[in-house]
């Protein structure tokens, strides 16, 4: 088993998509590409990917339009470039799964993570949830001498909030004016991710901005907390909550692989330097013996 100098940590990354760019994420998540941005995808492993929920239409946008037509969600008042989808990528480093049973354990873990997503966003608002099991971890594979895969979950969700529609002042019945006419499920990224948890100092005093208004905890950081507490309550142990202030939640798949490759290269360079230190004295001794032989 490979050495593990780093703590196993959970991570939840959040990405925003509009109507014009969600198809790129769909092609990656649903494995519709002929080639992939992430060059570590092993196409023979694609059948091992696990869908906990599949879209009920051919595309994500078609499903959203169908849900709007059925009155399940509202796009009322949104701009053409508004955020319509959130992609939640849930992840724990590779060796956590390798030590706990590999593929089968990862399926159990991410099925429970999918239920967390259902509770957080509402089951009807989850368009797709799929565990990728086809992306090879090159560094772990080389270290262990066998193929090791990086298991993670992609969930595409709709950021929905309940919005009250009021009767207008032009309503003929004066008693109805200003009262609630209907409650709709409005797509709104900004409202869905609005944080109301204040930041405090060590003494518990609220931290204020320059204008005197309170500062609030980042909503993505709160998501990290919620995920960690939910998963540990479901019996999954042996990992920590992702580091506070970490930018890992914003990394794309390609950026993640580049970061991993950099770490792998640094380790390789250190090994080379270590071998060179051993080689130089041996080379010097060999040279000296050759000089003696030639005398």
Locate the predicted segments by residue:
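N-terminal nicking endonuclease/strand-transfer module with a His-rich metal-binding environment
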Residues: 1-295
